[in-house]
UniProtKB/Swiss-Prot annotation:
Entry's Gene Ontology cellular component terms: cytoplasm
Lineage of origin: Bacteria, Bacillati, Bacillota, Clostridia, Lachnospirales
Name used for this protein in its record: Elongation factor P
Swiss-Prot/TrEMBL GO biological process terms: peptide biosynthetic process
Recorded superkingdom: Bacteria
InterPro entries with a match to the protein in the record: Elong-fact-P_C, NA-bd_OB-fold, Rib_uL2_dom2, Transl_elong_fac_P/YeiP, Transl_elong_KOW-like, Transl_elong_P/YeiP_cen, Transl_elong_P/YeiP_CS, Transl_elongation_fac_P
Entry-linked Pfam families: EFP (PF01132), EFP_N (PF08207), Elong-fact-P_C (PF09285)
Protein source organism: Lachnospira eligens (strain ATCC 27750 / DSM 3376 / VPI C15-48 / C15-B4) (Eubacterium eligens)
Keyword annotations: Cytoplasm, Elongation factor, Protein biosynthesis
Length: 185
């Protein structure tokens, strides 16, 4: 059990016959009236987002989420195949289940599959990945004073913005949470 006053980003709760993840929360103490917690919740199955206000003492059951290490094997049409590296069990997920969470993940890399009661609802890629730039325009030295970027396509097909000094064939590090360039590899 957790009360609304103890909300943290990322926790999952059971609310209104569903499993919801707290995306954002804010403690509000108005000048008049009692304090409340304003929270933005995301349904982990449907992906729907709601905003709601709760009394800080309102109690919720925590939902148990399994995060298991799996190896991303390959894509076969609209199915993406993963293997549990401990049990060697394989699982195939549809493109709808995967979404764009694999846009920075190469085949044979490790990911975490998040599930509730056996139903996979999210894929957590590694926080930082190294990828090769397959396509980008050449950067012209002296074009700018600071911080200029250009579009680049990496080996997984994802498009990101990189600094001008990055060239085709360079290996770069990308933060998968934001999709931003972090450094050269």
């Amino acid at each position: 059990m957790v009360d609304a006053g103890s909300f943290k980003n990322g926790i999952t709760i059971q609310y209104e016959n569903g499993i919801w993840q707290v995306i954002e929360f804010q403690h509000v103490k108005p000048g008049k009236g009692s304090p409340f917690v304003r929270a933005k919740l995301k349904n982990i199955i449907s992906g729907g987002v709601i905003e709601n206000s709760f009394r800080p003492t309102e109690k919720f059951d925590l939902a148990h989420i399994d995060r298991s290490e799996y190896q991303y094997l390959y894509a076969d049409g609209d199915l993406y195949n993963f293997m549990n590296t401990e049990t060697y069990d394989q699982i195939a997920l549809s493109a709808d289940q995967v979404g764009d969470s694999l846009k920075f993940v190469k085949e044979n890399e490790m990911v975490k599959l998040c599930s509730h009661e056996g139903n996979v609802f999210a894929i957590e890629p590694p926080i930082s990945v190294e990828l090769e730039v397959t396509e980008t325009e050449p950067g012209i030295k002296g074009n700018t004073a600071t911080g200029a970027t250009k579009p680049a396509i990496v080996e997984t097909g994802a498009k990101i913005m990189v600094p001008l000094f990055v060239n085709q064939g360079d290996k770069i590090k990308i933060d998968t949470r934001t999709g931003e360039y972090t450094s050269r590899a």
